[in-house]
């Protein structure tokens, strides 16, 4: 079993000077831009795959647990007001449902079957794209996205 919550720069925060904490956070934030820069070729491929599907009525599904799931739901909820798209085009699913947006739902991320059931409840089709979001890459609820490829081989999943 992989542990996602482990020792980090943020252990013993109460013992660190504020300046050190802020510098640590800033250093970590800088890693994000570099990671995105390295992934631009893969991101471009994904966008080029998704856009034609959406033009044919396809949807994007984000599936995540914990903070990763919350960020997927947040992103999906920002699409309608920001870009004027219908809320049914990009859908965020989080292990534990809406309750998990504000409160931890322990164990929900370990239920792969539940992830698959929630996804199939939307009647996914070959125009849809399913994107799993997991910091560890091993969250069972999120791994359910791989079932889409077995059931609908032309439906991309990430």
Q: What function would you assign to each model-found segment?
A:
Residues 1-35:
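Cofactor-/ligand-binding subdomain signature composed of acidic, glycine-rich
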Residues 148-154:
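Conserved small/polar residues in nucleotide/adenosyl-binding loops
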Residues 80, 84-130:
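Glycine-rich oxoanion-binding loops at beta->alpha junctions
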Residues 68-74, 136-144:
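Short glycine/serine/threonine-rich phosphate/pyrophosphate-binding segments
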Residues 51, 56-98:
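Active-site cofactor/substrate anionic-group-binding motifs, chiefly glycine-
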Residues 58-67, 126-138:
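A short, small-residue-rich loop immediately preceding and capping a beta-strand
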Residues 38-52:
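A short, well-structured juxtamembrane/interface segment
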